[in-house]
């Protein structure tokens, strides 16, 4: 069951599950949830009942769940009227169910890999599912280029795995839409493969003893990421690249020194000015490379090409200039969802409006600018679906308030701290997991402005693997007989 869970991660909107979850209006239906729920009920929970410890850093997570339940229960007393045919209780129940699915992914991923061998096997099974996803994405790119009509064979095959048809000029993999595929790549697969390459430790046998398979998968995955044309996904990858570049620049600057007897400048000491100069020069080069990368992407995506066109929208002034600029980038609709969610938070800052309920305030919270946007007009005229904040960070604020937001971010910080410790440890493969966790969290900072669902498995699994690695590291550091040999001193 564990292997099937990992292999099925790329399938995010399985049609039969979507029908069970809520019909055509439900798009988040990960097939991996089926083995995850079975594994939780048949193995994880029984292990807890036998006395196994809960995963590290579970306290803030359980506290967040308590806040979410309390906020959702209290939402029935708020002035939230039915909107687009949906009521508060139904929305809250469905939202809590998606959170339960996400927690299932986390706890199974944190509990099942109890040894380094299981952790390695987990990475191999993840790669099996990823190869299938990458192959299908490559087929999409090869057989449906540009604006050409999608062959019916591809369309019918894709409908077996997703409730949404393929996009003619963007790859989707097995996901609901290209941005979901990009999210899978930048918060799960690419971090693991990049971590393996940088740590020099592979879950597979190296090709000819030197070339890790993860390096090949990393290059393939980056190519597919570009073909998704997901701006947030690509920006997330660039964020990780910028952090790595800055860290490498800092370390290189520390190592570089002028030969002895040179570079002595009053008050700075030997070579310090030279080191600082090298760092600044490398940072300038890094910024230039990133800007050049954005410009190059703009040659393939007209939306990105307008990033540097600022002057025409400045005349609007104030927030109007911001909205006009985002509209120029074809991103204004997303910003409208964010602003609406933040206004809901301002009305209910302590506990929010309860999970799933931010959309009930959408009509009264939508900025005037939004009433001219086609997507907003369609929603206000009663289109199927329900408006969500479209950002995990905004959703946490709007639906769980300050308390829920702080608890969730504290939990993420704890996982990040655990990942950092793993990345600095002695066990080479645990360093892979630790580095991957850091890369995934860095990407999630940006990705949190794109997706807001709790039910998608990729982030939960990544955080669960980091937690499992922490437990394995703790077990390896204990004596074989489990006794504590730390000396204690008592006054005589």
For the regions a language model picked out, list residue spans one by one.
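Long extracytoplasmic/lumenal interhelical loops at the membrane interface
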Residues: 324-339, 347, 351-400
């Amino acid at each position: 069951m564990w292997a099937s869970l990992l292999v099925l991660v790329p399938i995010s909107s399985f049609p039969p599950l979507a029908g069970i979850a809520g019909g055509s209006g439900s798009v988040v239906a990960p097939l991996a949830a089926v083995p995850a729920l079975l594994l939780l009920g048949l193995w994880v929970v029984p292990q807890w009942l036998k006395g196994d410890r809960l995963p590290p850093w579970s306290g803030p997570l359980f506290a967040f769940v308590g806040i979410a339940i309390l906020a959702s229960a209290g939402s029935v007393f708020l002035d939230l009227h039915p909107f687009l045919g949906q009521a508060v209780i139904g929305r809250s129940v469905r939202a809590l169910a998606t959170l339960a699915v996400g927690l299932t992914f986390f706890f199974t991923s944190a509990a099942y890999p109890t040894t380094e061998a299981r952790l390695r096997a987990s990475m191999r099974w993840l790669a099996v599912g990823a190869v299938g996803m990458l192959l299908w994405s490559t087929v999409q790119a090869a057989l449906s280029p540009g604006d050409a009509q999608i062959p019916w064979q591809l369309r019918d095959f894709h409908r077996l795995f997703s409730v949404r048809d393929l996009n003619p000029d963007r790859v989707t993999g097995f996901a609901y839409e290209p941005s979901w595929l990009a999210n899978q790549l930048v918060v799960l697969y690419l971090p693991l493969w990049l971590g393996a390459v940088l740590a020099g430790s592979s879950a597979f046998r190296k090709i000819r003893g030197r070339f890790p398979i993860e390096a090949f998968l990393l290059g393939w995955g980056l190519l597919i990421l570009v073909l998704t044309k997901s701006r947030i996904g690509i920006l997330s990858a660039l964020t990780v690249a910028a952090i790595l570049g800055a860290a490498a620049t800092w370390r290189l600057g520390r190592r570089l020194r002028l030969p002895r007897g040179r570079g002595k400048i009053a008050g700075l000491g030997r070579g310090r000015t030279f080191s600082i100069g090298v760092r600044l020069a490398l940072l300038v080069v890094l910024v230039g490379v990133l800007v050049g990368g954005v410009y190059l992407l703009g040659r393939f995506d007209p939306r990105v090409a307008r990033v540097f066109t600022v002057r025409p929208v400045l005349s609007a002034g104030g927030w109007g200039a911001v909205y006009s600029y985002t509209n120029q980038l074809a991103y204004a609709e997303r910003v409208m969802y964010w602003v609406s969610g933040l206004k809901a938070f301002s009305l209910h800052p302590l506990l929010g409006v309860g999970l799933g309920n931010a959309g009930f305030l959408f009509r009264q919270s939508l900025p005037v600018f939004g009433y001219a946007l086609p997507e907003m007009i369609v929603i206000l005229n009663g289109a199927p679906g329900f408006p969500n904040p479209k950002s995990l960070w905004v959703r946490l604020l709007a639906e769980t308030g300050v308390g829920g937001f702080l608890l969730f971010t504290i939990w993420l910080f704890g996982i990040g701290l655990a990942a950092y410790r793993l990345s600095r440890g002695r066990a080479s493969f645990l360093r892979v997991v630790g580095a991957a966790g850091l890369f995934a969290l860095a990407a999630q900072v940006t990705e949190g402005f794109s997706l807001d669902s709790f039910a998608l498995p990729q982030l939960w699994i990544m955080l669960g693997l980091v937690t499992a690695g922490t437990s394995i590291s703790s077990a390896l550091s204990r004596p074989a007989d489990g006794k504590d040999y730390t000396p204690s001193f008592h006054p005589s």
